[in-house]
């Protein structure tokens, strides 16, 4: 049996997109995931949660592919003037109107302070632009999620304001004291105001306060499964340190019974938690314990020290000793024919005559993107979407 490998980039690559005569910075909250980023990670074409499905039905999939563009170009600190009540989560833009849906079932992330009383927020940014501030607001006690979010629903002052932060490995990491006395579900509203431009970015972050007094863990992000995997597939959690070196690897070969989209994250989490004291996967409770659950998206990856990131590699079996997909020289399309049909695994022939395979989700969404950036072999960021065969 031969195998071929795919990397599930659970913390996806972001891009610094420089359009002619206009530079655009992009970003959104990664930990805890913003509403738009969380829905993107569920899969724009087939999100898992009812709320994200409703967002796509209301605003289309493009809003999720553009998860890093929830912004206003001329905010310049006047946020209430450019983002109307009821449209805070979508930054007042029609493209993102699905994010404004008033509902109580938006997927939320449990958060708790560490031993110092802080929580580390991680913002995924695509370019090192100068920061005027990151402001973090929280909804008032008694906020009704079934009514559109208004500015008056937020506490009048931010509970955290960051004015100096360095971009490291594509992220801003900010330690903030969490607001006191908050329990249950709330919305954190984040504003990133640039100092080198009037542009500002906005993010609704759905959270739940666990009530834990001291949390020994730092969240890195959710372990998400997009689909069932075949028996014989191997899933590997890779943990990288601040220098990008492999710190730990935990592999599990799946069998019938633990290869479903809800089962294999549970099985991998159980193995990791048994083997490692540095990293655990699961749901955090009020006592600081991390317990795996059978779910395709609810398990989070936690570490005991800052400075780590993770990814999950998936090695799929190819029955009958066959070659890696595309190994026989055949292609599904000559690029850009059939562009809207491109998905993970699609093989195309580029303008250079070479064959390229569309990468696994979440990178697969870029395969349908603008050819200036994603044309296989020649786009400015083609390697984020395609693998040369």
Swiss-Prot record:
Residues 26-208 form the Chitin-binding type-4 domain. One of its GO terms (cellular component) is extracellular region. Residues 1-25 form the signal peptide. It comes from the Bacteria. The modification Phosphoserine is found at residue 210. Keywords: Chitin-binding, Phosphoprotein, Secreted, Signal. Its main location: secreted. InterPro entries: Cellulose/chitin-bd_N, GbpA_2, GlcNAc_Chitin_IntDeg, Ig_E-set. This is Chitin-binding protein CbpD. It comes from Pseudomonas aeruginosa (strain UCBPP-PA14). The gene is cpbD.
């Amino acid at each position: 049996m031969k195998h071929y490998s795919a990397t599930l980039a659970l913390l996806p690559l972001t891009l610094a997109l420089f359009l002619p005569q206009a530079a655009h910075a992009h970003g959104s909250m990664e930990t805890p995931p913003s509403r738009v980023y969380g829905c993107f990670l569920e899969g724009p074409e087939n999100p898992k949660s009812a709320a994200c499905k409703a967002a796509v039905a209301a605003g289309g999939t493009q809003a999720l592919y553009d998860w890093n563009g929830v912004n206003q170009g001329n905010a310049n600190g006047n946020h209430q003037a450019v983002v109307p009540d009821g449209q805070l989560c979508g930054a007042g833009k029609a493209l993102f109107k699905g994010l404004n849906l008033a509902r109580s079932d938006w997927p939320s992330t449990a958060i708790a302070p560490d031993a110092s009383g802080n929580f580390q927020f991680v913002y995924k940014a695509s370019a090192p632009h100068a920061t005027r501030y990151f402001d973090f607001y929280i909804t008032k006690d008694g906020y009704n999620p079934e009514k559109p979010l208004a500015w008056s629903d937020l506490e009048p002052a931010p509970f955290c304001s960051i004015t100096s932060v360095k971009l490291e490995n594509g992220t801003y990491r900010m330690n903030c004291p969490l607001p006191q006395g908050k329990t249950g579900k709330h919305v954190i509203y984040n504003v990133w105001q640039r100092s080198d431009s009037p542009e500002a970015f906005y993010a609704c972050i759905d959270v739940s306060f666990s009530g834990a007094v001291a949390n020994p863990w730092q969240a890195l992000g959710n372990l998400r499964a997009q689909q069932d995997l075949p028996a014989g597939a191997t899933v590997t959690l890779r943990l990288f340190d601040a220098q990008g070196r492999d710190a730990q690897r935990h592999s599990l070969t799946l069998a019938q019974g633990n290869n479903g989209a809800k089962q294999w994250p549970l099985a991998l989490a159980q193995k990791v938690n048994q083997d490692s004291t540095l990293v655990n996967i699961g749901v955090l409770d009020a006592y600081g314990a991390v317990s795996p659950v059978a779910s395709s998206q609810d398990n989070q990856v936690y570490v005991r020290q800052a400075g780590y990131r993770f990814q999950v590699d998936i090695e799929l079996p190819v029955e009958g000793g066959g070659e890696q997909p595309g190994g026989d020289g055949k292609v599904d399309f000559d690029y850009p024919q059939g562009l809207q049909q491109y998905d993970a695994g699609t093989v195309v022939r580029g303008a250079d005559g070479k064959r390229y395979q569309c990468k696994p989700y979440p990178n697969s969404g870029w395969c349908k993107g603008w050819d200036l950036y994603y044309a296989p072999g020649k786009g400015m960021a083609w390697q984020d979407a395609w693998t040369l065969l």
